[in-house]
């Protein structure tokens, strides 16, 4: 079952606020997960709005595969943040070993690229990452786009 909710605010809000949208729908939840889109982020990511942010969950092998592909294309890491995982007893969560949020610099060859050229690069790269992670069952790419 799909659940959709939205919060729009002129001031920054903590992402956990979005999880409150699920409260009224706890009964009958099919463990399919919950995802949300964040824009105009503050905190760790506030100073990197023009650079692509990769968000992914992966095994150790999946992380290595993704890093190899990104390096081969010419992306360089500017900043990486990993959330703390809270493994409480009783929760039916099968956590991946790595949850990664990386801000990346475009390849040097894209220094003077147009917006359309950069967007095409990001889409092609995300597809390449998703394909290899799916084939190896080693992770998921959630987003690869600037804020």
Mark where each language-model region is.
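N-terminal segments that mediate ammonia production and transfer
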Residues: 1-147
């Amino acid at each position: 079952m799909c659940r959709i909710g939205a919060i729009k605010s002129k001031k920054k809000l903590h992402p956990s606020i979005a999880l409150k949208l699920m409260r009224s729908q706890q009964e009958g939840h099919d463990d399919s997960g919950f995802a949300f889109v964040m824009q105009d982020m503050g905190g760790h990511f506030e100073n990197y709005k023009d650079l692509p942010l990769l968000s992914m969950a992966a095994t150790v092998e999946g992380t290595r595969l993704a890093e190899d592909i990104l390096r081969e294309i010419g992306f360089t890491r500017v900043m990486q943040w990993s959330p703390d995982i809270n493994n409480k007893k009783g929760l039916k969560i099968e956590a991946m070993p790595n949850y990664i949020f990386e801000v990346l610099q475009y390849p040097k060859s894209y220094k003077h690229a147009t917006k359309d050229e950069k967007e095409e690069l990001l889409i092609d790269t995300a597809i390449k990452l998703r394909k290899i992670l799916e084939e190896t069952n080693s992770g998921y790419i959630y987003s690869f786009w600037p804020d």
